[in-house]
Amino acid sequence: MSDSFLLEIRVRPNSSRNKVGGSAGDPPRLIVAVQAPAVDGKANAAVIKELANAFNVLVRDFTIVFGELGRDKRLLVNGDTQLLQARYDELLGEPKLL
């Protein structure tokens, strides 16, 4: 089954390492830490690359639908909704990034 899934994320640019996992805020958003700076779309590109790896989908399956210039973002990802939801829940439960 192929469909679309909406990801709620919080980006941490200029991090010491790239990592996807943990939650921040209320309602909880998935934390995506990237080494890239928030300049000229570099962080957005790095975020999508890290999410593609974490969810095992292609980079082209992601679309930023809200928050292109902010740290809180909503992304639409094409794929199996049940698998994406399960992976999202799994990543949300990982320890918070410091």
Descriptions of predicted regions:
Residues 1-41, 45-49, 57-59, 63-69, ...:
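Contiguous, often N-terminal, cationic amphipathic patches that form binding interfaces
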Residues 52:
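The alpha-helix within a helix-turn-helix
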